[in-house]
Amino acid sequence: MKENKNDFKPYIPADQVVPEFTVTALILGILLAVIFGAANAYLGLRVGMTVSASIPAAVLSMGIIRIILRKNSILENNLVQTIGSAGESVAAGAIFTLPALFLWAKEGKIDSPSILTIFLVALVGGILGVCFMVPLRQALIVEEHGVLPFPEGTACAEVLLAGEEGGNKAGIVFSGLGIAAIYKFIADGIKLFPSEIGYDIQAYAGSSVGIQVLPALAGVGYICGPQISKYMFAGGTLSWFVLMPMIALFGKDATIFPGSEVISTLAPGSLWGTYIKYIGAGAVAAGGIMSLIKTSPLIVRTFKQAMGSMAKNRATADAPRTQRDLPMPIILGIIAVIAVAIWLLPIFPVSFLGAVLVVIFGFFFATVSARMVGLIGSSNNPVSGMAIATLIISTLILKATGTTGTTGMIGSICIGSIICIVAAIAGDTSQDLKTGFIVGATPKLQQIGEMVGVIASSAAIGYVLYLLNAAWGFGSNEIPAPQATMMKMLVEGIMNAELPWALILVGVFIAIVVEILGIPVLPFAVGMYLPFSLSAGIMAGGVVRWILERRKAANESEEKEKKACIERGTLFTSGLIAGEGLMGVILAICAVAKVDSKFVSPVALPQIASLVIFIILLAYLYFLCVKKNNKTN
């Protein structure tokens, strides 16, 4: 371990000073933070997962700074991606929890959360996530260099280093962005062809087959890879082709809680919404908790390291440039001010006990998250599992201390939201600091940049949530908000004891069986919870990645080209996700302004046309990847 640390030399040496924290980097980073935050908010509310924004942010930064502004500094580009990627992490934490407040407002239980409340919850969680990561940097990033791989952080560094040699990678991202935006506008704006095709299988009551033919879903499947995609698809298959037909077969003319209608009269979509949601919620909750239990030895070890690192941390003014962190007195002061603000400010519906829980859970799960992403990457970080564990414990504590009813439920969601954002930002910060460690960035400036990204995206996320809710409503087919819906049900169930626990326990035991079989529970459980058509669209992208990965490489040159081939696909599909997300936000604005009907096509193509167009998109993705292009390698 020590050998790795001492032998490693960053790309930019500590004694070399190059442009880093510049006005250009700040403006571009803030812009990308807002863009990727909005795009990932839409994606997460629609499919229940987000993707890392570090690599597309780095590529776009290189393209804009070098091509448009005629400047070039690898550390400047690194700071842009550090600021820009914070937007995705704030969005991930916020959309997994905060829509629960809107759902309660829709039911008339509470008033809708204000923009200021959303901003402060996101801001507090984001700043705490950065602060908690500062004392962990030395232990996780430096001391364990060569031990913890930090997949996204290392890959982002490789992209930045490759960018020093030139290339056209930004063009690939922009092409994906443009294609997806146009595709989404034609499908869901003009409505020339349906974005979802499906058929209820009459001979197999209760089942339905379909696919959402949208670019972002293919992008998610490609980036997550064939393994995660097939686990989600398997979960969806279990729900829609086993559980739902069984409910239809055995329920028949019965009315079973929580439903209020005879089961035989329910269409597959209603069966899913009435019963499968609860089974899926039980599986997701169990999966999140099991992932924490499995990593408990790792959690304890990392926590001990973090405490030791905090005890040893000193002022770093005299340290080499590449080892300078924000001073611990400043970090501890920020944490103390935030804790007092959570306790005293009326905008936070949280008591003194809640403020204490935020700090304790926050540091604990920041430690867990930073270590987890170092091992398995940000895309596999069980942030929602940490939020579930926090919600269960905090709700039980609040209920035991007499804070019940809507006050207790709001307090639980706010605590869970802050912790969810803490975990997401801590994971993102650790990946960014690893990238900086490899390229030779200044940690202190990255930590400040991360906070800038948090502030910018926190200021925007409230407006994005209000916009999407006003356009379609959380819990709708367009934005089902799966995690937030599940968090809402979980808190209600603990506070009011009104949940259909039999259905939830079915999901829990399915998750246990899946775990025994050695299958990752969370992607399987999310597939159970989401509409099958979503999992099918994601699987399509995963199949393209699977075909590409199966190509044989006879020598080192072909292996290098195969790696470049996969990378081209990652850049293009990152653009697909961003493009559809941004167009989704634009269409939401049109829906709220009531101008969306003005550009609807008088002609609508049949469902088969949608499938053909989607296959053409997948084929284009494949041929883009396999096409040899020296400029992008």
Q: What is each of the regions a protein language model found here?
A:
Residues M1-N633:
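Alpha-helical multipass membrane-protein architecture
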